């Protein structure tokens, strides 16, 4: 059978296929070109103190914006901080729903003109974060203190958190219970040698030397933690006996002065009487001589 020698007629199906393939390549190329200026986030970190939690990352955007998503380990993603030019996002309201849960966040990068984006945005995942185990403890506050004789009584005030239960904000003690300890460091004002006492309540009652002034500060501690166990130390407070000593000294000086005044008055009266008696005697003795 002879083979036709005429010109080959193009197949319509093949032409359509080539056109579709070319179009797909163009679309992919446009997608790649559209994302070349989008920089993905890096150095994503959780900054959390007393459960107030901020997600931070780099870099500052130039031609793009960010959206943050957060999710419990086995939950669904929830969008936060939509199309922002900031490099931080407050996610406190999400993590306080269950502070014992482990959370993951991711930062998505979009072109500045998000309406032109037709591809899935690139993103970067954060490290996992468990608030109960990892939030930093804030600086505690000494609510009150009193030294009476040989006893020093110190009361620590619990910080409030944004964790809620029954529509009320909880304190650190409410959240951590007996896991929360306080350590009191104290020393004589005239010395540098420190002692310490620890309690899982909010009060200290320690033995001290009577008449000595003491200085002290407290620190919150979660002993069950492996990291972030301790808070910063509270400002130093000191007892003072200056007013008591001044009152006692004033009383002593006043008493001595009163005794001296009484002594002077008595002495003056006595001397006056003695002089009067002597004068009378002298007058009697001199009377006959004067008469003569």
Swiss-Prot record:
Q: What SUPFAM superfamilies does the annotation carry?
A: Fibronectin type III
Annotated glycan sites: 43, 153, 181
**Assigned GO CC terms:** cell surface; extracellular matrix; extracellular space; plasma membrane
Q: Which first-to-last residue range defines the signal peptide? A: 1-35
The primary site where this protein sits is: membrane
Q: Which residues lie on this side of the membrane: Extracellular?
A: 36-248
| TM region(s), chain numbering | 249-271
Subcellular locations according to the entry: Membrane
InterPro entries tied to this protein? FN3_dom, FN3_sf, Ig-like_fold, Interferon/interleukin_rcp_dom, Tissue_factor, Tissue_Factor_CS, Type-II_Cytokine-TF_Rcpt
Q: Which cysteines are joined by disulfide bonds?
A: 81-89, 215-238
Lipid tethering residues (S-palmitoyl cysteine): 274
- Which positions does the motif WKS motif occupy? 46-48
Q: Which GO terms describe its molecular function?
A: cytokine receptor activity; phospholipid binding
Q: What does this protein do?
A: Initiates blood coagulation by forming a complex with circulating factor VII or VIIa. The [TF:VIIa] complex activates factors IX or X by specific limited proteolysis. TF plays a role in normal hemostasis by initiating the cell-surface assembly and propagation of the coagulation protease cascade.
Task: State the family named in the UniProt similarity comment for this chain.
Answer: Belongs to the tissue factor family.
| Name of the protein in question | Tissue factor
Q: Give the species.
A: Bos taurus
This chain is encoded by the gene named F3
């Amino acid at each position: 059978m002879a083979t036709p020698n005429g010109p080959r007629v193009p197949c319509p199906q093949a032409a359509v296929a080539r056109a579709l393939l070319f179009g797909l390549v163009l679309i992919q190329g446009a997608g790649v070109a559209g994302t070349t200026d989008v920089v993905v986030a890096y150095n994503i970190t959780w900054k959390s103190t007393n459960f107030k939690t901020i997600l931070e990352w780099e870099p500052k955007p130039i031609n793009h914006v960010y959206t943050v998503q957060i999710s419990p380990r086995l939950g669904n993603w929830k969008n936060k901080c939509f199309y922002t030019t900031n490099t931080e996002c407050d996610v406190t309201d999400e993590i306080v729903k269950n502070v014992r849960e482990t959370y993951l966040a991711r930062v998505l990068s979009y072109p500045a003109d998000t309406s032109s984006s037709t591809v899935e945005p690139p993103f970067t995942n954060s490290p996992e974060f468990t608030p109960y185990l990892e939030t930093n403890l804030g600086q505690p506050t000494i609510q009150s203190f009193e030294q009476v004789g040989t006893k020093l009584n110190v009361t620590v005030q619990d910080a409030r958190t944004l964790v809620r239960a029954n529509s009320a904000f909880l304190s650190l003690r409410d959240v951590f219970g007996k896991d929360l300890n306080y350590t009191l460091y104290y020393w004589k004002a005239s010395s540098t040698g420190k002692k310490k006492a620890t309690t899982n309540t909010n009060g200290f009652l320690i033995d001290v030397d009577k008449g000595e002034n003491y200085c002290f500060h407290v620190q919150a501690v979660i002993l069950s933690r492996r990291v972030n166990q301790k808070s910063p130390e509270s400002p130093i407070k000191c007892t003072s006996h200056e007013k008591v000593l001044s009152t006692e000294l004033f009383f002593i000086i006043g008493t001595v002065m009163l005794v001296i005044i009484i002594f002077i008055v008595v002495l003056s009266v006595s001397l006056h009487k003695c002089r009067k008696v002597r004068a009378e005697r002298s007058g009697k003795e001199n009377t006959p001589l004067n008469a003569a």
